[in-house]
A protein has these predicted regions:
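N-terminal signal-anchor transmembrane helix
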Residues: 36-46
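Hydrophobic membrane-insertion alpha-helices, especially the h-region
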Residues: 13-32
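Soluble "head" domains of membrane/secretory-pathway proteins
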Residues: 2-8, 12, 32, 45-293
Length: 293
């Protein structure tokens, strides 16, 4: 009988250990660290290379929790809440996020199957611009993004690029002629901040406003309407960010598709676990446990 009780006690302890371990693993996976991500493209080189495997912490800016999968399947919008993290995103942080568009460029529709890795070069409340190839933010003297790539861009002209690479968001030659060398200034909305609306700047913020309200913006007789309501100003509900790849000559980023809603963010890339050259399959020993800066 004593032996039976001893075996039963051991089995219960083992089951409790397994349950606790699985629980901790779920908590770790959901709230702290994303699964290892393999990098397929060169858009963030030299900081992150194609073939790198990276670790991403969700503690910056905080884990994202989905509210109701049934709801977003019905109305097309992903409903999320952001838990408090250890700190907010800072300029030059390298972040992983869900791509904010899914097939249709006229509306934001978070693609849960597509992950992007880019560097944050402008925060909510910043005003971002590119002046002769150099990234700038109002009242910020720090270098933003990959400085030596931007210096290379200063020496090049429109003739060196195809129109697809040269022309930028919002892709409207009538009101804006922004390009990869001269862009902005573009105000990056912060939650609670308001802007005035007219036909011209509606082009910059149309997708953001429609994403937040789930209603359509339109223009009638030179006036801006949200559904049937005249709109002179708009107060943003979410924070937004300007994301850019370090390899500025080969990166699909905010220069082309606009600002990133905060609810698309997954977390901050912290280090490379290991790396293989995709062309040769050889292990890159120099990139083993390499901090991402």
């Amino acid at each position: 009988m004593k032996r039976y009780k001893s075996i039963l006690k051991s089995v219960i302890k083992f089951i409790m250990f397994i349950v606790l371990s699985l629980g901790l693993a779920v908590v770790f996976r959901v709230f702290i660290v994303a699964p290892i991500i393999s990098i397929p493209s060169k858009s963030m080189e030299p900081a992150v290379m194609a073939g790198d495997r990276i670790i991403v912490t969700k503690l910056i800016p905080g884990a994202r929790v989905f509210e109701d999968f049934r709801q977003f399947r019905i109305d097309g919008k992903v409903q999320t809440k952001r838990l408090r993290g250890i700190r907010q995103v800072r300029r030059n942080n390298v972040l992983v996020f869900n791509f904010p568009y899914s097939g249709d460029w006229d509306r934001i529709d978070m693609d849960l199957n597509v992950l992007y890795l880019k560097r944050c070069v402008a925060l909510p409340g910043d005003t971002f611009s590119i002046e002769n190839g150099i990234y700038k933010v109002n009242n910020c003297l720090d270098s933003l993004g990959c400085a030596f790539r931007q210096q290379e861009l200063t020496l090049q002209s429109r003739d060196d690029f195809s129109p697809v690479i040269w022309n930028c968001f919002p892709h409207d030659s009538v009101h804006y002629s922004w390009n990869i060398k001269d862009f902005g200034p573009l105000y990056v909305p912060a939650s609670g901040n308001s802007i005035s609306l007219d036909i011209r700047n509606m082009l910059l913020y149309k997708n953001l406003i429609e994403y937040e309200t789930n209603q359509k913006l339109s223009v009638h007789n030179g006036l801006v309407y949200l559904a049937d309501e005249r709109l002179n100003t708009y107060t943003f509900k979410l924070n937004y960010y300007f994301m850019a790849g370090d390899n500025i000559f080969d990166s699909g980023d905010s220069r082309y598709w606009g600002l990133l809603p905060e609810d698309c963010m997954i977390g901050k890339a912290i280090f490379v676990t290991h790396s293989k050259d995709p062309a040769t399959g050889k292990f890159r020993w120099k990139r083993l446990i390499k901090i991402i800066k």
